[in-house]
Amino acid sequence: MNETPTLPTAPQSTVLVATDADNVHDEVAAALSGDHQVVRVHTGAEVLTAVTTHQPVLVVLDLQIGNMGGMATCLDLRLEQRAERIPAQRIVMLLDRDADAFLAHRAEADAWLVKPVDALVLRRTTREALTA
């Protein structure tokens, strides 16, 4: 029997996406799922628990998410990190318009981009955020 040996594959790193918009999730998953396992939560209130459970290498926050917006969620993650209750996270925010960059900066996001999500820009932004 002439079987080709299979090489072991490295486990994929996890990216957490927080959005209540299906189209935003689909765009992010399509752009990143080749290199990462994409896990979704629908509200900002779910992010902290998901970070603890899934230990993502990157968190992608939609500025406009459910009960706790992306800015508040980003600030909450930064406070938890400073209190050493969670490991440091790289955070990319998805904004609605260029003017929202001020909010992303104030929320201490590592990077941001304006929706609609361009797959190439998101992959580049993700790579840069992870290597910073």
Q: Which role does the model predict for each range below?
A:
Residues 11-23, 27-29, 59:
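Conserved acidic segment of CheY-like receiver
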Residues 61-79:
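Conserved phosphotransfer microenvironments
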Residues 127-132:
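The C-terminal output helix
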